[in-house]
Amino acid sequence: MISLDLLLKHMQWANKEIYSEVSELDSKVLDYFVVDPEWKVKTIMLHIAKASNNYAQYLQGATEPTSLDLEEPLNSDDIKILIEKLYEIDQVLIDNQNIGDVDLTFITRRGEQTHKSSTVFSQMVFHAAEHRAQIVAALDKHNFRSINLDNYDVWSYIRAH
C-alpha cells in the first residue's frame, strides 16, 4: 500500500521542481491564467504555499493559523524565496505525519470545522497536485510547454530517489 510518507515527500519534491522550472521562464508567464484571470500563475503559486501553511498549522494543533507573510512572486528571485518557504512548510507536514488519525478542530472562512488528520493530509496532497496542474495548464494555453507533469508524477519521484 502506498504510504503517506511517500505521498508527502513526492508532493514536496514536485512542488519544488515545478516552481523551479517556472522560475527559469520569462516572468511574463506569472500573469498567465487558464480561464479566470483572478487565478494567475503567480496567484496559484502563492495560494499553494498559503494553503499548505494553514494545513501544517492545523496538523500541529493550531485553531486559527497565522497567515504566511509573502506576496505573489513577480520574478525568479521571488519564486526562489517562495520555493524555500514552501519546502520548509512541506517538511513540517512530513515531520507531523505520525500524529495518528486524530480529530482536528480549526477555524476557516467557513467557520469552525472538525476533520480527521487523514482528511487534512489527503486534502493537502490533492490541493497541491490540483493547482500544480492548473499552473501547467495556464502555461500550456500560452504555448509554454517545457513543463511536463509526467516528469513529476510519483513514478518519477521514485526513480529520482
Residue spans for each PLM region:
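Active-site rim elements
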Residues: I2-L7, I79
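Short, contiguous alpha-helical
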Residues: D5-S20, E24-D69, G111-H161
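Helix-adjacent hinge/juxtasegments
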Residues: A62-G100
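Acidic catalytic patch
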Residues: Q97-G111
